[in-house]
């Protein structure tokens, strides 16, 4: 007896995860008034009618492509300031997920959903600023939340996709209403302070100590220190 997987079964699994990812992207774009929701809607229609992923793959590229999207109020999207880091990290994760699945489908292979989630985007870099005059480093609330989103969302997206509960996850990100967010933010602030890095809720890019100009600074966290 052959040990090869049932072709029909694995294609149904491919269909399910691909459509889940696209539907989640469409909902996120719809909720935030992003015009790309129409493109994703066409992706879904084309795949369901012809099995082709070419329209979706055509969204990725250079300037003006889906790669350039940033969900924010400045771009006339429907979103609040606090939700921006979560919505954008979720969007990037869903884009990577749908792009990866589309390429597997195009190659006629079976999706290994666990492997896809393992290999998907995970930045885990904390961005802040450092004074060009006195050298004082600091992080802001928005960048702290962006880091936390890159840390917490992968597991949340995986669970939502596997359980077909992406609607609930999107709704939570757009508030944001993330489990243990306050505690996790305080943990990062404490780690930063232990490393001599200040924290500010302000959007001001000037030095908190001396008011001078600053430059972008990046830190990696190992879980215990920065």
What would you call each of these model-derived segments?
Residues 118-126, 194-202:
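Short, flexible, mixed-charge glycine/proline-rich loop motifs
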Residues 1-43, 98, 102, 125-129:
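Short terminal alpha-helical segments
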Residues 131-134, 207-210:
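Short cysteine-rich clusters marking metal-coordination/redox-active sites
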Residues 114-115, 168-192:
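Short, charged low-complexity linear segments at domain edges
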Residues 136-139, 213-216:
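Short functional micro-motifs and their immediate structural scaffolds
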Residues 50-85:
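Short, charged early-sequence alpha-helical segments and their helix-coil boundaries
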Residues 146-157, 210, 222-226:
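Short cysteine/histidine-rich metal-coordination sites, predominantly Zn2+-binding motifs
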Residues 141-144, 217-221:
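Short Cys/His-rich "knuckle" micro-motifs
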